[in-house]
Amino acid sequence: MTQQPFQLPHFYLPHPARLNPHLDEARAHSTTWAREMGMLEGSGVWEQSDLEAHDYGLLCAYTHPDCDGPALSLITDWYVWVFFFDDHFLEKYKRSQDRLAGKAHLDRLPLFMPLDDAAGMPEPRNPVEAGLADLWTRTVPAMSADWRRRFAVATEHLLNESMWELSNINEGRVANPVEYIEMRRKVGGAPWSAGLVEYATAEVPAAVAGTRPLRVLMETFSDAVHLRNDLFSYQREVEDEGELSNGVLVLETFFGCTTQEAADLVNDVLTSRLHQFEHTAFTEVPAVALEKGLTPLEVAAVGAYTKGLQDWQSGGHEWHMRSSRYMNKGERPLAGWQALTGPGTSAADVGALLADAVAQRARSYTYVPFQKVGPSVIPDIRMPYPLELSPALDGARRHLSEWCREMGILSEGVWDEDKLESCDLPLCAAGLDPDATQDQLDLASGWLAFGTYGDDYYPLVYGHRRDLAAARLTTTRLSDCMPLDGEPVPPPGNAMERSLIDLWVRTTAGMTPEERRPLKKAVDDMTEAWLWELSNQIQNRVPDPVDYLEMRRATFGSDLTLGLCRAGHGPAVPPEVYRSGPVRSLENAAIDYACLLNDVFSYQKEIEYEGEIHNAVLVVQNFFGVDYPAALGVVQDLMNQRMRQFEHVVAHELPVVYDDFQLSEEARTVMRGYVTDLQNWMAGILNWHRNVPRYKAEYLAGRTHGFLPDRIPAPPVPRSSPALTH
């Protein structure tokens, strides 16, 4: 290779890499095993020399340093299998663009991961099936049914990405920085690798496996693995192979900076993700363990798993430093007094740990709120879909005003009549569902009022008091206001509870308990996300862009409104269609577009008048160290990319989903209607932001911000209140 395009930056390495002493055993075993499975000579994919050059034994010995010999051999076999699968799929299906054969191949693989031991397996037809059958049989006896289910799903997702890659069109475009980080997470194998970390260390208890803190651990783990790889592989991928999916190239292109500056910035992002990992491990994981009532042994299991992910990070770095596959010479030198030598001193890099990393970590906590920023700048926002409004709009406005007064929303010191009118939530609802009847529009307006009021209430009432405990109590009680099957409902103690009980009864009257469940989860996710925002507010912690975007979808209440859209679809569309990658991609593109749109319009309101830190423009400013115009450019581009992604999924990916799931014409009609619903949703939200006073500079300048005079917010109601049956 030619001269390196940049010097490697100082890496944040708080944990030394360690090598498993059973390395040679794993190397020898994996070679024998691969030959027995038919992966080597005669496979048309690998020879033994290929396997030896890859040296997956060394990778696994570094990333799983503490497990015993048989466990390391099994884990190494899993990595041999997954890399062989990838190369096998490339040779057999990608090169020939044979979708039908590729899909048939993928459809059989779940048959070799039965959740029930008695289910049996078909006879393997190729080395991929033979390897999976053998590995599953050797692995699952030691693990619980919950782990089997999670690992089977993670494996299916990892394999199915090959199918979507085969179907997608390579647009030849360098991604937006925030979009890129999220994209790498989607196509990576982090949940799969994390499952094997559980096998090597300790299984995560089912009670917390699906919680946000454990998800964040896995996602920050994933981001750090991918960004580290981008730094080491830039020269090979970008200069030698012409690859566009590299984080250094993404930042270099988008910010117009030098390659060295982009590499340093990628390392800042990598360091931030590791800080997020540590922050979650030290603050959110203990809290959720306490909340879920984990036993000491279960807490120890979560700790061992967390340490296992840290070991994977350290070992993965050491692997990159030693592999001939990567650019790994010339890390930027330290000052003489800082340069330590000897075994294990990479983790004692004083410069990295006490200078750059500390300054970078502090950036998230040193933001000064209530800065004067002036009116929000509204850039060119692309909207290809026409606006339609429900003719029931005027009636909904009158009804919402009366309903809010009845519920007590206008008498708690957060909203008054003027503030409600400035929101004009029926205008938003009328655009979201232009075909709505009067009753439907009244109900939709009520849901928007509940969500918007709660979003204002939590930071104002609990944030100023720094009272996270009271906020958690409120969140728990709100969940209790949504019974699935006749459970007792607490007597309402404030306007939020009163309005939610009313909305729940009116919305779910004709639903079964199973139909109510996703709606309840959507509301729970939204109120839990308000707690996340509140926790950051109390700590004065500006989140990083990826974590922010993930949580913003929940705080915006998007799943709630989309769930109401889907509720009338009936059984024609199977649930797995909604869970498919393209449909989730479609929904997330629309959701992100709307959330970012809100942040652009609300920038002055939130930053200058409310001291808010949860705004995408501010998050990008803080994270990348750029000014308002540059950050606004990133957010504007991300919005427009999300719209293009939405259009791409509709045109190219949904037809493939319809065929893959063999949907009936009725189901296809329902899905086309759902796409129209999403188009109306985006057009209606843009129209609402453009026309309501809530975000306009002249309205903001004339308002009282904070608690309204003469109105006292209702205190939280004790948990022990007698219940009512509703």
Curated annotation (Swiss-Prot):
Its cofactor is Mg(2+). Pfam families: Terpene_syn_C_2. Disulfide bonds: none annotated. Its EC number is 4.2.3.22, 4.2.3.75, 4.1.99.16. The keyword Transferase does not apply. Keywords: Lyase, Magnesium, Metal-binding, Repeat. A motif (DDXXD motif 2) lies at residues 455-459. A motif (DDXXD motif 1) lies at residues 86-91. Pathway: Secondary metabolite biosynthesis; geosmin biosynthesis; Sesquiterpene biosynthesis; germacradienol biosynthesis; germacradienol from farnesyl diphosphate: step 1/1; Sesquiterpene biosynthesis; germacrene D biosynthesis; germacrene D from farnesyl diphosphate: step 1/1. Residues 2-354 are annotated as: Germacradienol/germacrene D synthase. Magnesium. Fe(2+) or Cu(2+) ions are very less efficient as cofactors. It comes from the Bacteria. Gene3D superfamilies: Farnesyl Diphosphate Synthase. It catalyses: (2E,6E)-farnesyl diphosphate + H2O = (1E,4S,5E,7R)-germacra-1(10),5-dien-11-ol + diphosphate; (1E,4S,5E,7R)-germacra-1(10),5-dien-11-ol + H2O = (-)-geosmin + acetone; (2E,6E)-farnesyl diphosphate = (-)-germacrene D + diphosphate. The earthy odorant geosmin is also responsible for the 'off-flavor' of contaminated drinking water, wines, and other foodstuffs. Belongs to the terpene synthase family. Tow-domain protein where the N-terminal domain catalyzes the cyclization of farnesyl diphosphate (FPP) to a 85:15 mixture of the sesquiterpene alcohol germacradienol and the sesquiterpene hydrocarbon germacrene D. The C-terminal domain partially converts the germacradienol formed into geosmin, the characteristic odoriferous ('earthy aroma') constituent of Streptomyces species. PANTHER family: BETA-PINACENE SYNTHASE-RELATED, TERPENE SYNTHASE. This is Germacradienol/geosmin synthase. It comes from Streptomyces coelicolor (strain ATCC BAA-471 / A3(2) / M145). The lineage of its organism: Bacteria, Bacillati, Actinomycetota, Actinomycetes, Kitasatosporales.
